[in-house]
Amino acid sequence: MESVITATIIGASLLLAFAALGTAIGFAILGGKFLESSSRQPELASSLQTKMFIVAGLLDAIAMIAVGISLLFIFANPFIDLLK
């Protein structure tokens, strides 16, 4: 039983770590491409900024979904029922 709980905690930790890493890389790429496209066509900066904020919200949603899934695994572990 302890091995299932330990594996679940390690899995939830890895889930959060990779979600944070993916979000950070996504924000870095998004910010770089926004600055690059705004410097090429400054007249489209306001339109690009709106689209950038929409994509940034979607990137944050990925991390929030990972937090929800990891909290589910930590506090309401469905794998413990398989041992009974």
Curated annotation (Swiss-Prot):
Signal peptide region: none
Membrane topology: Multi-pass membrane protein
GO molecular function, one term: lipid binding
Subcellular location field: Cell inner membrane
Site feature (Reversibly protonated during proton transport) residues: 60
Top-rank taxon, per record: Bacteria
Pfam families: ATP-synt_C (PF00137)
Transmembrane residue ranges: 9-29, 54-74
GO cellular component: plasma membrane; proton-transporting ATP synthase complex; proton-transporting two-sector ATPase complex, proton-transporting domain
Keywords, alphabetical: ATP synthesis, Cell inner membrane, Cell membrane, CF(0), Hydrogen ion transport, Ion transport, Lipid-binding, Membrane, Transmembrane, Transmembrane helix, Transport
InterPro entries listed in its UniProt record: ATP_synth_csu_bac/chlpt, ATP_synth_F0_csu, ATP_synth_F0_csu_DDCD_BS, ATP_synth_F0_csu_sf, ATPase_proteolipid_c-like_dom, F/V-ATP_Csub_sf
Job description of the protein: F(1)F(0) ATP synthase produces ATP from ADP in the presence of a proton or sodium gradient. F-type ATPases consist of two structural domains, F(1) containing the extramembraneous catalytic core and F(0) containing the membrane proton channel, linked together by a central stalk and a peripheral stalk. During catalysis, ATP synthesis in the catalytic domain of F(1) is coupled via a rotary mechanism of the central stalk subunits to proton translocation. Key component of the F(0) channel; it plays a direct role in translocation across the membrane. A homomeric c-ring of between 10-14 subunits forms the central stalk rotor element with the F(1) delta and epsilon subunits.
Cited HAMAP family: ATP_synth_c_bact
Record's subunit section: F-type ATPases have 2 components, F(1) - the catalytic core - and F(0) - the membrane proton channel. F(1) has five subunits: alpha(3), beta(3), gamma(1), delta(1), epsilon(1). F(0) has three main subunits: a(1), b(2) and c(10-14). The alpha and beta chains form an alternating ring which encloses part of the gamma chain. F(1) is attached to F(0) by a central stalk formed by the gamma and epsilon chains, while a peripheral stalk is formed by the delta and b chains.
Family from the record: Belongs to the ATPase C chain family.
Name the UniProt record assigns to this protein: ATP synthase subunit c
Species: Haemophilus ducreyi (strain 35000HP / ATCC 700724)
Gene: atpE
